[in-house]
Amino acid sequence: MMGDNEGRRTPLLNLGVQVSMRVLTIGAAMASMWVMITNREVASVYGIAFEAKYSYSSAFRYLVYAQIAVCAATLFTLVWACLAVRRRGLVFALFFFDLLTTLTAISAFSAAFAEGYVGKYGNKQAGWLPICGYVHGYCSRVTISLAMSFASFILLFILTVLTASAARHY
């Protein structure tokens, strides 16, 4: 009798964890995207004004577009996870979508992080100077966006592991 109860509670508990983590992932990805999109600062260097915007960097644009894709895919898999509780055959497809979404999230984070690193520390060999001393607020908001992006990746990674574990049992 106890085994029957556990069998019924596990999918529901797993569904609760899945839904909670997917909602948190969507929130983190949307926050990352919003902070990056609204990030803009104008600075003056030696009397010359220049503007720092996310759209001037292909890596930051990629991060924004990837976060949009992460939100859409996670919303899709949120519905899919609810269906997978009733139809066990859908679990592998859920794992596959989670894996693709996780890979998208980490690739976008990595590209944007590399760009942010160069912006903060420069690259002496290439002759690129750090710019964060001039646009400190811009760099701080990029850091916040990257932290939220990394949080969405971690949540997706955990979801992928949980889904892979569930797929193994079915």
Swiss-Prot record:
Stretches in topological domain Cytoplasmic: 1-16, 84-88, 163-170
Ranges in a coiled coil: none
InterPro entries cross-referenced by the UniProt entry: CASP/CASPL, CASP_dom, CASPL
Compartment(s) of residence: Cell membrane
Pfam (any one): CASP_dom
Keyword entries, A-Z: Cell membrane, Membrane, Transmembrane, Transmembrane helix
Tissue specificity of this protein: In flowers, expressed in the anther wall.
GO cellular component: plasma membrane
Topology term for the membrane: Multi-pass membrane protein
Topology feature Extracellular, residues: 38-62, 110-141
Transmembrane segments: 17-37, 63-83, 89-109, 142-162
Family: Belongs to the Casparian strip membrane proteins (CASP) family.
Assembly with partners or alone: Homodimer and heterodimers.
Identification of the protein by name: CASP-like protein 1F1
Organism: Arabidopsis thaliana (Mouse-ear cress)
